[in-house]
Amino acid sequence: MPKDRTAAGFVLVCEAKGQRLYLLLQNARHGAWGFPKGHSEDDETPMETALRETREETGITDLQVVPGFEISDTYQVHTPKRGEYRKTVTYFLARTPKAAHVQSHEHAASGWFDYTEAREKLAFPALQETLKKAEAALKGEKG
């Protein structure tokens, strides 16, 4: 039985000119949109993984992590190469000062989207729920 895997990433948000935009990446293999994330290496913490993967996939290093936001989702994965295994993905929330253009060899496309557009692009309910919680957390800070 293949070993369970862990991954981590960020819900990245840029707030400029009164608008809140979220970064989404479109997977080049299966076309689904999601947040920057990747698998953990060795003994990395989820935060270390999220920082490394975000830097590798987006080039963005100027992040302000929002304290207290951490969401994990565990689900079954089946691939021809690895077989069936359990994967746990942890997401953190961070701001970045500008909506930088992102190019990644792992992704077919990328973009910064408002909440409604981002929610429509996210195909997986767990990612939609993560986005919803991120939006609520950001609104709560202002209140």
Region annotations inferred by a language model:
Residues 1-21:
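Conserved N-terminal beta-strand and adjoining loop/helix that marks the start
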Residues 18-61:
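Conserved Nudix-box catalytic region and its N-terminal flanking loop in Nudix hydrolases
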Residues 34, 86, 112:
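Short aromatic/basic micro-patch
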Residues 59-99:
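Active-site segment of metal-dependent pyrophosphate-handling enzymes
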Residues 91, 95-132:
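NUDIX/MutT-family hydrolases
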